[in-house]
Amino acid sequence: MILGVGSFAHSIGKALADAGADVSTYLTRNYGHFPPSLAGETFHRDAFPSPVPLIRERKIDVVIPQSIDWALAPWAADLLKSGVGIFSPTGEAMRIERERDFARELCAKFRIPFPKSFVASNRIEAERILAKNPQPFVIKNPLCSPTSPVHTILCETVADTRAWLRHVNYAEGVFLQEYLGRAEAGHIALVSGGEIYSLVTNQEYKYAFNGNQGIVAGAPLGGLVERDENDKYGLARGLLHPLLPWLRKVNYHGPIQVTAIKSNSSVGRASSRAGLEKSNARGGSRGRSPHQKWHVIEYNIRIGVTSGPMILRMLKNPADVILRTTRNEKLKLEFNEELNFGCSLTLAGYGYPFTQVRGPQLPLEVDGKFDCDVWWNEVAQGADGNLVATGHRIADVIALASKLDAAIAMAYANIRKIRVVGSYFRTDVGQSLWPPGTV
């Protein structure tokens, strides 16, 4: 049973159903209800205040949460007591994503590079920190949640930071993380039986528009994955494996993703020279110093809406892998040959990424048949049977292939078959930020 909505529930559910699993979805939000129904039965939270009776009645083996907020639901304790497998770490293990400063402390303990960071409870404290550390900061909420009062604000100069500190919501304080440039990448693994099993190295295109311009959107506009069970780029060795003592101590079993930036830690530090600040604002030069190393930006404990569906398609037995992970058993990962790379593209709707701007429900047209995965998100079916776009994120189009260029080309060929007035997609995924460590 998936706990979620939209393209996450549609994609994860369909990938597992195709692998032979009996899939259902408990709808946890008030939108995106139609797409999961294409993968299996759905249950609305208004009709079923808790999923636990459904889990018992239907003899569910595994639940897969879309968000870490399931742990704050009134039924969370009952879910844990039910004995069902949960494809997520629980308890103390969740803190590595939930609490940003806890992740920083873990990295300090295990000597993992992490940007200089501070927590401030109000504007006065935040401005005092900036005065003592005159450098650009990325502004985040101290607690990670889809409903956080502050979503990531990437400031590339001291002046940017100062301006935003006057404007943000301090309801939960702010987490100020040193800006280290744009050479970002991620690595996703499973932790089970006290071991780390690498899956893919990934890239997310988080900026709203081509050329990595505009604001950091609420969710990525595109993504790439490369099958990487041997940790080709060293992200797991440097940033995940040192955590093994803690992972074992807290009985961590489930997905883990690290997002990191390659930097020598001088990028983004204070300087009186305007030239350095101008270079920082552009994300630094494309050539990377041989002395640069990966720095953790954050950890996530979910398989993710961008990379998750591609990972499940790459695995030969995804349902079995998930089940064994929830049981904390040793894993033997088998991949489908020739599916070495994946590309995900998002079709964004009217007004996105500025979610305050909303349009009407709009007709959705498809010209021809798809030959890759298309996962509907904020889409519904009208009384006439035709599809309509109902929100800001319409679909995720995902293609896999043996070569990266082939996966990208297939994804673009298919996303161009969808038409919704006012919609758009990035046309440059793969042209920057890849290979990992470049901008």
Give the location of each predicted region.
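Short, low-complexity intrinsically disordered segments enriched in A/P/G/S/L with frequent Arg
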Residues: 273-274, 280, 284-291
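ATP-binding N-terminal substructure of ATP-dependent carboxylate-amine bond-forming enzymes
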Residues: 1-91, 124
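Phosphate-binding core of ATP-grasp and ATP-grasp-like enzymes
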Residues: 168-173, 180-227, 236-266, 291-296, ...
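Generic C-terminus detector
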Residues: 383, 389-439
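Active-site "cap" helix and flanking loop/linker of ATP-utilizing ligase/carboxylase catalytic domains
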Residues: 236-256, 264, 300-371, 382
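Glycine-rich phosphate-binding loop of ATP-grasp-fold ATP-dependent ligases
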Residues: 114-117, 136-164, 181-188, 210-231, ...
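A conserved helix-loop-beta module that forms one wall/lid of the active-site cleft
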Residues: 87-152
